[in-house]
Amino acid sequence: MPPFELGDPIPSETAHAVSVSLPTWSANVGYEEGQDWVVKRMATGYPRFFIHRTIQAFAADIVATHVSTKAKRTSDITAMLFPTPTIASRCVDFIRSRAPADVCSNIEVVNLVLDMSDPEARALEPLCPSISAVIMPQDGFPFAKQYWQHSGDGVSSRRAEFCHGLFKDGLLRPDTELRNAAVSAAKPCRGPKRYQRQASLDAGGNQQTIMHGHIHRATGETAMIQETSRFLEERFGRNLDLSFVHPAKSAIKRRIAGALRSADHDLGGSPSLSEKQMSSNTRGIANLREEDIYLFPCGMNAIFHAHRALYSIRTPPGSTPLKSVNFGFPYVDTLKILEKFNPSGALFYGHGSKSDLDDLETRLESGERYLALFCEFPGNPLLTCPDLVRIRELADKYEFAVVVDETIGTFANVNVLQFADIVVSSLTKIFSGDCNVMGGGAIFNPNSRYYSALKSFVQQQLEDTYWPEDVIFMERNSRDFVARIDRVNANAEAICRVLQDHPLVKTLYYPKYNDSRANYEAVKLPQGGYGGLISVVLKGKKQAVAFYDAIETAKGPSLGTNFTLTSPYVLLAHYQELDWAEQYGVDRNLIRISVGLEGTDELINVFTRALKVAEEQSQYP
């Protein structure tokens, strides 16, 4: 892979890249400390931490237009963009629960919708490209950014790019303006659909049925979708066939279920995938259906809504909410969700060890009760695997839900659904692989005691906000997912062999070699491997810095890319709490390696050379 300069998107020349090049240890520190020599060179960043430039530009234009009618200075105002009014309202509630009174009293929401009196806008109606902007004083931005980062509810860069063009052309306008306009002849935009069954007539008289998140349209609306697709290509230069969006969602869901072979990706064929019976799957749950799988704009959004759903169905009106349990050292925002979106907070077991599980059992035996237990399998970055068999036994006995994040293990290597009520995953990672689109997934176990209540919550409360362009990219990227996993598994084991016996390596973290290997083996599929994520701690910081600076891979945030990606993960994820992380055995100088598809011999040489540089550095005092 060619070297990346500081701040370059990874992959290079990719408008919607998910990672960014931080090629030296000092660049990572500079990023965390907000130093200009790093921040000003960043073309992009990881989307939940770095707001994409296209989103920033759109927000600035909304603010400029809005304040021109309010006699305020643009420099005093900022905006955060969300796909729907409901989500924007949740962000406002979050800000008002934390921000000073002068900030809270000056928050507004501007909802931009299609001006359906314009014939061009009517052609875009099936896309429903809405935007809700939370406009606030600059002092409110840090609170809005917390919501954006933790929840994953923000707009995607592709949605923002498309909607910004409509806004500039006058096709997307504030709903308050349109309410006062004479638009009675226009068809209303239905807005993001909820995952529910319903039959209705649209404003044009065509019957439509929404079943399990898929819209089945009459002939008139099918023709409209075809017209919209032609219009998108002619007017905006976008080759986006909307007739493929719903089959693409179906294909993604079936891949997640393990019910679709890699070769089955002809979305233009006869009956759509959503209309076929899902006859078998690799999850070991015979009654699992496609409609038990939900797609989200990113993985953290899947976790956020899993928690939101369980909180809702298990917290009767007027009752004190139950705490959740975070078992094992988690990805940074998972714990933040459990702590910040539940007034009762969370019980945190950072080691995820047998003694932690013993302590939890003691608490349960003494009468303590919990909303849900959230865990990763394996954990990030230590690759520790919780004892899912025992956790399931405790959950059944003491009635709490189990949510397992399978992002790192992947369903091609492990089967965790049998022990979970909900399984979540970041599709942004190895499922996509191309590092150019975000996505998340959640599976409801149909055998869960909470299944019916969860389905009811979804039908009433969950909005489908996964932008169609992102869906199309995710479906295309994921077609060869299983084959890529096999290659990554083999490459990861080869790199482990290079690291395992090297004198500079203090600790190697990988499911095959960790103390918790038995827990991994309990759910490992017969054809599965141990995944593509490795963490390593060298003998000292000096050696870690030398190794990182010398390694000839892409270097930046994220994981699960088709190319090897290296990161001083703890610096990036926990820079403000390094001492806290070390209490749980997470070394501040840990280096995380996401293994890619390069040739095995090539990777062995790359890691051998970097270790040699680190070795030479250790010769100097």
UniProtKB/Swiss-Prot annotation:
Its EC number is 2.5.1.48. InterPro entries: Cys/Met-Metab_PyrdxlP-dep_enz (IPR000277), PyrdxlP-dep_Trfase (IPR015424), PyrdxlP-dep_Trfase_major (IPR015421), PyrdxlP-dep_Trfase_small (IPR015422), Trans-sulfuration_enzymes (IPR051750). The keyword Transferase applies. Pfam families: Cys_Met_Meta_PP. One of its GO terms (biological process) is transsulfuration. The modification N6-(pyridoxal phosphate)lysine is found at residue 429. It is an enzyme of class 2 (transferase). It catalyses: O-succinyl-L-homoserine + L-cysteine = L,L-cystathionine + succinate + H(+). GO terms for molecular function: cystathionine gamma-synthase activity; pyridoxal phosphate binding. It comes from the Eukaryota. Pathway: Amino-acid biosynthesis; L-methionine biosynthesis via de novo pathway; L-cystathionine from O-succinyl-L-homoserine: step 1/1. The keyword Amino-acid biosynthesis applies. Keywords: Amino-acid biosynthesis, Methionine biosynthesis, Pyridoxal phosphate, Transferase. Its cofactor is pyridoxal 5'-phosphate. Gene3D superfamilies: Aspartate Aminotransferase, domain 1, Type I PLP-dependent aspartate aminotransferase-like (Major domain). Both met-3 and met-7 are required to form a functional cystathionine gamma-synthase. Belongs to the trans-sulfuration enzymes family. MET7 subfamily. Catalyzes the formation of L-cystathionine from O-succinyl-L-homoserine (OSHS) and L-cysteine, via a gamma-replacement reaction. In the absence of thiol, catalyzes gamma-elimination to form 2-oxobutanoate, succinate and ammonia. This is Cystathionine gamma-synthase. The lineage of its organism: Eukaryota, Fungi, Dikarya, Ascomycota, Pezizomycotina.
